Regions:
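Beta-strand-rich N-terminal accessory domains
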Residues: 1-80
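Extended, loop-rich substrate-binding clefts of extracytoplasmic carbohydrate-active enzymes
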Residues: 2-3, 82-136
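Beta-strand secondary-structure signal
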Residues: 12-14, 21-23, 109-113, 129-131, ...
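Acidic, contiguous internal or C-terminal segments within carbohydrate-active enzymes
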Residues: 15, 116-156, 160-167
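Surface-exposed interaction patch
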Residues: 23, 65, 73-85, 172-175, ...
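A short, polar/proline- and glycine-enriched secondary-structure boundary/capping micro-motif
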Residues: 33-37, 89-93, 121-125, 151-157, ...
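Active-site/ligand-binding surface loops and adjacent short beta/alpha elements
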Residues: 163-221
Length: 221
């Protein structure tokens, strides 16, 4: 276990258990690197550099895109800042570029916490926690929890954004299996739209098959 000083990705925490090694950064509570016997299990990024897109980030209080940054909740309309202009969307929440705090640390685990204050597009309060744990036999586990510490009910979603890899080889030959039988179609800006059976969009991965040239930027259910 090792902590480095502040840089583009905040602080860096290095964890190890058996043949597994992980690098966690405090900005976005991100997973910057995960290896087994030296082989990469996620696409890594250098903590001293700004990562590609939301590589490795925790996405709170929503993952994916909200078209035009506009949503309705309990009869009221809210407007979020547009942070992906190519899709004209509010993407991946409000904590991906915040510097989380390290609250607990061991040789094999780290706990990070963050406070999300109210804002005009999301006037709710959350206290969030992420725990990364390495086990020499089972590898990495991630636990994410958020508590609504405001006085009214809050809309909430969560996701994580690692880019899985088999030691940085091409995904075309990978076998992919996902136990989901529904998927959201996307519009020309990759915003999710209507729910379909996976067969309708030719995205049925309930049985393992090669990814090949299939483009997957969808929400499955």
């Amino acid at each position: 276990m090792q902590i480095t000083n502040m840089h583009c990705s905040g602080q860096t925490v290095s964890l190890a258990a058996g043949d597994y090694h992980a690098t966690i950064v405090t900005v976005g509570a991100g997973l910057a690197e995960l290896t087994f016997q030296g082989c990469h299990l996620v696409i890594p990024h250098k903590p001293e550099e700004m990562p590609l897109a939301h590589l490795g980030k925790v996405l709170i209080p929503w993952p994916n895109r909200i078209a035009n940054g506009c949503y309705r909740y309990q009869g009221q309309e809210y407007q979020l800042p547009i942070n992906e202009h190519s899709s004209k969307a509010a993407i991946h929440g409000l904590l991906a570029w915040r510097d989380w705090q390290i609250s607990e640390l061991t040789a094999t685990s780290v706990t990070l916490t963050a406070f999300l204050p109210p804002s005009y597009g999301y006037p709710f309060m959350l206290a969030s926690q992420v725990v990364y744990s390495l086990n020499a036999h089972t590898g990495l586990s991630v636990e994410i929890a958020s508590q609504n510490i405001g006085t009214v009910a809050a809309p909430y979603g969560v996701g994580i954004h690692p880019y899985l890899t088999c030691n940085l080889t091409s995904v075309d030959e990978y076998l992919f299996q996902l136990p989901a039988n529904q998927v959201y179609a996307v519009d020309e800006h990759a915003n999710p739209t209507t729910l379909h059976h996976v067969d309708e969009l030719d995205l049925n991965f309930t049985q393992a098959k090669k990814i090949a040239a299939t483009k997957i930027d969808h929400t499955f259910k």
